[in-house]
Curated annotation (Swiss-Prot):
Domain tr-type G: 98-283
Function of the molecule: Promotes mitochondrial protein synthesis. May act as a fidelity factor of the translation reaction, by catalyzing a one-codon backward translocation of tRNAs on improperly translocated ribosomes. Binds to mitochondrial ribosomes in a GTP-dependent manner.
Entry's Gene Ontology molecular function annotations: GTP binding; GTPase activity; mitochondrial ribosome binding
Tagged with keyword Mitochondrion: yes
Protein name: Translation factor GUF1, mitochondrial
UniProt record similarity statement: Belongs to the TRAFAC class translation factor GTPase superfamily. Classic translation factor GTPase family. LepA subfamily.
Pfam families: EFG_C, GTP_EFTU, GTP_EFTU_D2, LepA_C
Catalytic reaction list: GTP + H2O = GDP + phosphate + H(+)
Region (Disordered): 23-85
Source species: Pyricularia oryzae (strain 70-15 / ATCC MYA-4617 / FGSC 8958)
HAMAP family registered for this protein in UniProt: LepA
GO BP field: positive regulation of translation; translation
Transit peptide, from-to: 1-29
Amino acid sequence: MSCCKGLTPQCVRVRLPRRPALSHPARLYSSSSSSNSHSSPSRPRLLSRPQPHNAILHLPRPNLGSGRYDRIPQARSSHHSSAPMTDLEQRIAAIPIERYRNFCVIAHVDHGKSTLSDRLLELTGTISASDENKQILDKLDVERERGITVKAQTCTMLYRYRGEDYLLHLVDTPGHVDFRAEVTRSYASCGGALLLVDASQGVQAQTVANFYLAFAEGLTLVPVVNKIDLPTADPERALKQLRDTFELDVNEDGTGAVLVSAKAGTNVEKVLPAVIEQIPHPTGDPNAPLRLLLVDSWYDTFRGVVLLVRIFNGTVRPGDNVVSLATGNRYTVGEVGIQYPHPTPQTALRPGQVGYLSFSPGMKRIQDAKIGDTFTFQGSEAVVEPYPGFEEPKPMVFVAAFPTDQSDYQRLADSITQLTLNDRSVTLQKDFSEALGAGWRLGFLGSLHCSVFQDRLRQEHGASIMLTEPAVPTKVQWRDGKSTIITNPTQFPDQSEYHGKIEGFYEPFVAATIAVPEEYLGRIIKLCEDSRGEQESIEFFGAQQVIVKYALPSMALVDDLFGKLKGASRGYATLDYEDAGWRRSELVKLNLLVNKVPVDAICRVVHTSQVERLGRKWVTKFKEHVDRQMFEVVIQAAVGKRIIARETIKPFRKDVTAKLHAADPSRRRKLLEKQKEGRKKLRAIGNVTIEHSSFQKFLER
């Protein structure tokens, strides 16, 4: 023990990096010398014994060099201790909340939101300008493939303006109406928004809808006209539409708005100064009890559920003990960080910031992360008022999904479950079909949402599914005052079976806003009238643009109304809609029968005006995909006991008279009668074999 000479026998100072038993003394004993002390969420045992900065632990002499302390877990930061900050965090910590700006980009689909976001990230140095960094915030393969934004994504930026650093938080939102819930949640973390308009297309349907959503939330709007470099661009017309439609203070000479080309980078440098000058900074008290809002969440295989949060009051650090005001569940914070643009751990999140946090041990169930929930420190529940939260999006389209091969059921079940963990707007329950076997009934926000889910399943998991025709929920009002919501068409009651017990049927309607050039207005009105729509208003603005509003049944939307609008207007019409409640309607259940046996996979609730058209379409199309049998196959479309349409598949012909002499008519007649009786008996007891591929081809649009 000569190396310890002069020390007291009770303890020794552990600074012996050369001793083999203490192979990582800096990591084990000095919280200040470990750069990763804030990102080790797995061992919470030292939280009750935080060490001061640059502390030297004194350990008993007899254990020195025994190897026992190699297993001591790394100390984690708590709200009582400090940890070394990176250069990035030191720069962030020096920025007061008055120089924070939280904003989002809202626009109609394909008006250039993601491209503008890329230019802003490049301008602030958050990403480098390269071809690999296109659509950097569109992280899903389906987003890059389709060129649309499906999931709202966030990013923190640092920007130098007039000699001072500003902390900017950007949210790139979806433009399609199916993902409206993503846009609404994004508003909760923002103080303003860039209202983006395509200079060649002008104000579109979803521009109108997004404006009123943002206006209702009290967001400050900064008008931006994009794509000014296109040959068809007309910025003056776009500015006039912004002024006339929304009463924004913009002029045709461009004052009051920012004219840019996000693709070419023209005038993009003027956007962020406009954000700083016009959008107000957030407010918050770092010394008040923690009050944070859960904006979004996703599932991580290693960390469990990761939360995207907006901090309103207080400061949250790794090691803090927090509680959910919605569920009462208690957690220990394991890691906090920002999206820059990828997850970047930090030692703290402060008021006004938007970032992510995970727990240690991790939150295991995505259902425990309730969007709109409020979290605070344990013990502060009584003094912190919860936020009202968000309205849960309601599925508008339901489909039955089945594996193309029943042997793949379990693998497909795992893939669907994993996707629904990160897309909570999808509802899922088990289903069974006599024709297609075991499957699921899935609920989606719209037809595009359903299509995107199917693409993600194929791209991310290599799995394919067979989907039935989309259906909307219907409501049955009983005479005893009760009501039932039907999402599975096979469960829709038949009037003949429940005669006198049903008061009426109801279907969901939407308030649709359609923007279209005036020259196509007549076609659009006819299409809406044919879809059982009721016109509510019509407004002409500008030289050529018209906005018409209709009350339309949701059934029209799943019947490819969007595609029909595009076809009737040569691609110029745009559609936006919102839920408009239930309306009484004449509804019936249309079944497809094969030899008088209903095929449960092909069943739909329709309006009485559509029964004949759809029934004839079904029997004609299904006949093309059913193989001939040894007996006659009758395909029928029926409502209750009433047959709407019929097609017949003739049996294979076997010449039983081939070996007979031509002069023996009685024998010929006898054999033909016997064959006829045999086919009749076979038809009565035989089952029609319909391959899965036949159903798949029939169900394809």
